[in-house]
Amino acid sequence: MLVLTLGYTATIWGTVGLRQWIVVFLTFCAAQQGGGATEGWSMLITGALVGLLGVPAGLYGNELSLRLGLRTTALAVFLASALANTLFGFAAMLSYGTAAVLALAAGFLVQGNFSNLTSGLLAVAEPWQRGTTVAVYSCTGFAGGFIGTLLFGLALDCFGGTARLAAWVVAFGICLVGAVATG
């Protein structure tokens, strides 16, 4: 149960950077290309879609887990999301449209472990302890979200702010650190 709980913490840590900062990052991407005003609504829509992709991503991750096994699926999703988060900071060097499409792809990948880890946890928990088990599991996930968001923001500030590519690369790299440290 500890491994599944830490895996969930890593999943939330790795997800919050993308989900919480996507609109600001896309604003930066548009500004890098000399745009901004015309992409305004698409930034908000892309941000909303990244959040909504958690549902099908979680379902797909759970289905893969049933077919390939929880360990194999969780590891594959961790590696794919670590790679996606690490490289996503560099997306600002691409066109705004490409960055938005990559945001959707990364948003899907990083949320792929939600359901399979939760169902795996419930499968191994004692029936009379499931409520407490899920409560602790949720609290550690939220702690990962808090720490990940805080460190993401600190990385942005320490490396020059939201108007610098290096700051975004380091901040998205923080998502990788969370996955490696707890996963």
PLM feature spans:
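Extracytoplasmic gate region of multi-pass secondary transporters
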Residues: 2-55, 148-149
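Intracellular helix-loop hinge segments at the cytoplasmic ends of transmembrane helices
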Residues: 24, 116-124
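A membrane-interface helix-boundary motif in multi-pass transporters
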Residues: 36-38, 154-177
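Helix-to-loop junctions at the C-terminal end of transmembrane segments
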Residues: 56-70, 156-157
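C-terminal transmembrane helical hairpin of 12-TM major facilitator-type secondary transporters
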Residues: 69-117
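MFS 12-TM fold signature
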Residues: 80-85, 175-182
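A late C-terminal transmembrane helix in Major Facilitator Superfamily
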Residues: 124-160
